[in-house]
């Protein structure tokens, strides 16, 4: 019998859905895109226009033709950095507290507040 691997524990991620990021390693290095979905249990993110895979879909009904569809596959979150669209530069983040007491994410290189 084969055992299934238990899901790894949830890890806090530095990116959220809707963030603009830049890929820093791999075949899509340098590409900029928006985070469509995060998968914290595996520390992965799905980014628009990055890691495109093709899938061959069989016809479901008789007379219908098969298709080749493409989709974005997840990549590891350590391969991405947050990207400043104003300064056109990727940066690490730090957490700061604003004057009104909110904890926000800030880009280290530019000082730009993200959320």
Swiss-Prot record:
PROSITE patterns: RIBOSOMAL_L24. Keywords: Ribonucleoprotein, Ribosomal protein, RNA-binding, rRNA-binding. One of its GO terms (molecular function) is structural constituent of ribosome. GO terms for biological process: translation. SMART domains: KOW (SM00739). One of two assembly initiator proteins, it binds directly to the 5'-end of the 23S rRNA, where it nucleates assembly of the 50S subunit. One of the proteins that surrounds the polypeptide exit tunnel on the outside of the subunit. Part of the 50S ribosomal subunit. This is Large ribosomal subunit protein uL24. It comes from Synechocystis sp. (strain ATCC 27184 / PCC 6803 / Kazusa). The gene is rplX.
